[in-house]
């Protein structure tokens, strides 16, 4: 949800082919003035909380939308957990500057970002929010339930052996 979630499917394919990753950056810059904080309530098995956020992602990847890269030891592909990332809405221009600088260098410890490892989550909003599902339009929803089905897919190397542990 949130800032830049529509960039992946709004960027014309011809522009993507021509400019690659830069096409997404240019489309994102074009939309920067439309960014609005979103009120979200997040429920996980461990806790429930709410707040105003610019972005919420649920992934199991070392890269989120090509704008942020996690350290390899922060993400495991077979631990049964998603990485739930919440970027809080900055209160002022100083916080916005700090957030922008931290995102540029992939600082996971920025005070405006929460990274949770969750097996499932319910995310609700008073208004329907646009979802991106693997880079495609996922529709608009007020309530979304996500659950990690641990071990549902077995990954096999070219030598035919299953990978027991992937980081």
Model-derived features with residue positions:
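Long C-terminal subdomains/extensions of small-metabolite kinases
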Residues: 1-167
């Amino acid at each position: 949800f949130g800032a830049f979630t529509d960039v992946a499917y709004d960027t014309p394919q011809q522009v993507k082919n021509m400019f690659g990753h830069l096409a997404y950056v240019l489309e994102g810059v074009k939309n920067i003035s439309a960014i609005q904080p979103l009120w979200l309530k997040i429920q996980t098995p461990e806790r429930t909380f709410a707040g105003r956020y610019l972005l919420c992602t649920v992934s199991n990847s070392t890269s989120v939308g090509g704008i942020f890269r996690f350290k390899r030891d922060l993400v495991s592909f077979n631990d049964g957990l998603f990485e739930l990332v919440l970027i809080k809405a900055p209160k002022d221009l100083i916080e916005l500057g700090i957030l922008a600088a931290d995102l540029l260098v992939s600082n996971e410890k920025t005070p405006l970002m929460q990274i949770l490892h969750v097996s499932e989550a319910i995310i609700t909003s008073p208004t329907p929010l646009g979802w991106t599902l693997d880079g495609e339009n996922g529709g608009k929803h007020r309530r979304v339930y996500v659950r990690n089905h641990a071990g549902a897919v077995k990954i096999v190397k070219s030598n035919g052996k299953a990978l027991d542990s992937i980081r």
